[in-house]
Amino acid sequence: MKDIKQVIIAPDSFKGTMEAAQVCRIIQASVRNYFPAAAVRCIPMADGGEGMVDAYLELLGGRKVFLTVQGLQGRPVACHYGILPDGTAVMEMAACAGLPLLDGALDPMHTTTYGVGEMLLHAERNGIRRVLLGIGGSATVDCGLGMAAALGYRFLDKNGAQVEAVTCHMADIASIIVPDRKPKLDIIAACDVDTPLCGETGAIYTFGKQKGISEEMMPQMDAQMKRFARIIAKQTGVNVLDVPGAGAAGGMGAALLAFLNAKLKPGVELLLDAVGFDGLLKETDIVFTGEGRIDWQSIRGKVPVGVARRAQAAGVPCIALCGSVGEGAEQVFQKGVTAIFSAIGEACDFSQVKKNCIRDLKLLSDSVMRLLAAGSVQTLQAGVPLVLDKKYANGDFRGRWTKQTGLEHAQTAGISALDREITTERKEAR
């Protein structure tokens, strides 16, 4: 077995339970317990959602600026953004328009992104000229109406009367009044997904449910968003309908493109480039990444796949540790993930998940290191994907190996280095 001498740990936060830096520390402790001679580099990641400001400040240095802006429901909310040593401001849309701020009281028709515009204006007034704005983790589907209103844009109905800049009035908009002066900011939007604005893979159908939109409402809302996009194109000359990332944050990507001439880029790629990740991989033996849930959405711009692609290109195995796995998780194997290990093995509500998250990740991380110490790193280096689901209810682990040519389960075997028995079933590839 090749010794593990150089390790990179680069996870995203586990949404609602652990920040990325905490995840790093837990995995790092396990690595040090089982591979004490290994050099470990921790890179807390973010893809444009919660934790992005902290990730950049921890990795690159800088300071925080605190302010109060209008929140999702019109009430003041305290938030902050970061300023890097080169003067770039790093912001999170989620700081003033994120899902956690609603505490479960979803209201997609009336929530606003006005506070995002106020943050941008605050930065400009304080001499900032370059902004990196993360637009993940939002609670809104207003296509950036609120943000635009804060910047001086006005929206009129067919009679020329001003329309309130909230989602429930989007269908009434007939024209847009562009302000005489726009903020003089060079904005890069860090997107956590590459979702287009409309259609079956667009903002409403993909993320509407988690923001409180019923399936019955989706066709109507998708249609009104498409109609608004045509108005944008007519009055600004910017066609946002087919741009990857335009549907991020309920259409905020489209608004940033059209109203502020922003550039849309994958958030994970921006951070990996900022820390020189490709160079760090040259002497690395294995990479650990992860996020709260790995499923079909993970291939659309999330941290584990972004990290895994780079690792695969460098010939380095990449293991993903997550809270849970969902439908389509196997798709990440085609993007460079070598193995997935899931911490949640029994049905429970989120309060229990939150209560036990540190314990569960510690146990999972220790088990992964024991597996590697037992010799399985050779298999991982060979590029054979593995899914390992932890089942606390019955105390065993069930792993399955998958190949592009079919499904082949590993032979049943006991590995003495594990606290629990690892059982696998063999099935000939079809």
Where are these regions (language model features)?
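Short, Lys/Arg-enriched N-terminal segments with co-localized hydrophobic residues
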Residues: R426-E428
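N-terminal loops that bind phosphate or other acidic moieties
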Residues: K2-I135, A139-Y392, G399-W401
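Cationic, low-complexity basic patches in intrinsically disordered or flexible, solvent-exposed regions
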Residues: Q404, H409
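Short hydrophobic alpha-helical segments enriched in small aliphatic residues
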Residues: A393-G395, A410
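Short linear motifs in low-complexity or flexible loops
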Residues: T412-A417, T423-T424
